[in-house]
Amino acid sequence: MQFKNALTATAILSASALAGTNSTTSIPSSCSIGTSATATAQADLDKISGCSTIVGNLTITGDLGSAALASIQEIDGSLTIFNSSSLSSFSADSIKKITGDLNMQELIILTSASFGSLQEVDSINMVTLPAISTFSTDLQNANNIIVSDTTLESVEGFSTLKKVNVFNINNNRYLNSFQSSLESVSDSLQFSSNGDNTTLAFDNLVWANNITLRDVNSISFGSLQTVNASLGFINNTLPSLNLTQLSKVGQSLSIVSNDELSKAAFSNLTTVGGGFIIANNTQLKVIDGFNKVQTVGGAIEVTGNFSTLDLSSLKSVRGGANFDSSSSNFSCNALKKLQSNGAIQGDSFVCKNGATSTSVKLSSTSTESSKSSATSSASSSGDASNAQASVSASASSSSSSSKKSKGAAPELVPATSFMGVVAAVAVALL
């Protein structure tokens, strides 16, 4: 084994401190590998096979056909398996705890990785594993999970996790389903650019800080009550959204470019703390699932081909408002009444249907109502037409996968005031 630091007593103590070990028994010197060590052959791993605990960061790389860590139950440090072009399988079924990270990256023929007893790890990073089909753990505690650019068909190794900081699954083209026991996500939940018909179930999830879903076919959030920051559904093939337990979104709520979405039910949602955007959902003709929303802390934009928009409980919008339907059956009457009562507190109010247009520049008292035409502007000042600028929600990923996005959201148009708020919402989701 090629040690990067000599096994002096000082190095051993330093490695133990860095790993934060709480062992009450001394670790044999042969099991303390210094700050880090690299194994390039199974023979290197066999030298520590008699250890129940190793102290330090272990890297496995080089021309190994298969590799195994026998007997080791704990790594007080990180385990990295990296850039091994011939490694086809790896097993470490005795390991229960890794105090640092488990990193598996750039393993082009690795088909299986087994950590059958692993219950606790700080982070798991699985990136660029183009041949892997199985990954197993007994994971109970982890802070961060990133799975990107793999051929996994399922991620059952994470199915029993209750809490995480980050859960990011992207660009796994064969991944078609995932059922999670997560109850809270303290930073972000992101799912994007996976299989064509991906179905997700997060029915135990009660609280999350941020959620962004892209390229998903079906989603279930049976218990979700609060999203502390932003919630976005972008470029999905979802036929419906049912978040009937959700009562609050602390910042932005975006439902953008979901071409097959025909129903959105948010029947207990009362508060959106930032921008509220429903845009370019071509099959969403009746929008009646937001009838309990009372306050919107930013701008509101609803655009599409809808004939019904029920915001009957809305009392306050602290930004501007843009309602634009291509359907001549949509009526602006209720929204104009909302504006005349002073509920719209931003700098502009625009409401259009297929036949008429009403726009108000709220920094002045001018109001214009006119029949729409193919060439006429919605507002003589031009501010209202700027309010139709679309929201940017282009799909993004953290990997080098060549998979193309299933759809592209409109381009972000820089603007001030009302649209500045809308743009900020979109940028926050990227």
UniProtKB/Swiss-Prot annotation:
Comp. bias regions, Low complexity: 362-402
Keyword Cytoplasm: no
Entry function: Required for proper cell wall integrity and for the correct assembly of the mannoprotein outer layer of the cell wall. Important for apical bud growth.
One of the protein's GO biological processes: cell wall organization
Post-translational modification, as annotated: The GPI-anchor is attached to the protein in the endoplasmic reticulum and serves to target the protein to the cell surface. There, the glucosamine-inositol phospholipid moiety is cleaved off and the GPI-modified mannoprotein is covalently attached via its lipidless GPI glycan remnant to the 1,6-beta-glucan of the outer cell wall layer.
Maturation-removed propeptide residues: 408-430
Residue ranges of the region described as Disordered: 362-411
Protein name: Cell wall protein ECM33
Protein origin, superkingdom: Eukaryota
Keywords: Cell membrane, Cell wall, Cell wall biogenesis/degradation, Glycoprotein, GPI-anchor, Lipoprotein, Membrane, Phosphoprotein, Secreted, Signal
Family: Belongs to the SPS2 family.
Keyword Membrane: yes
Species assigned in the record: Saccharomyces cerevisiae (strain JAY291) (Baker's yeast)
Residues spanning the signal sequence: 1-19
Bilayer topology: Lipid-anchor; GPI-anchor
Phosphoserine modifications at: 340
Residues where lipid is bound covalently (GPI-anchor amidated glycine): 407
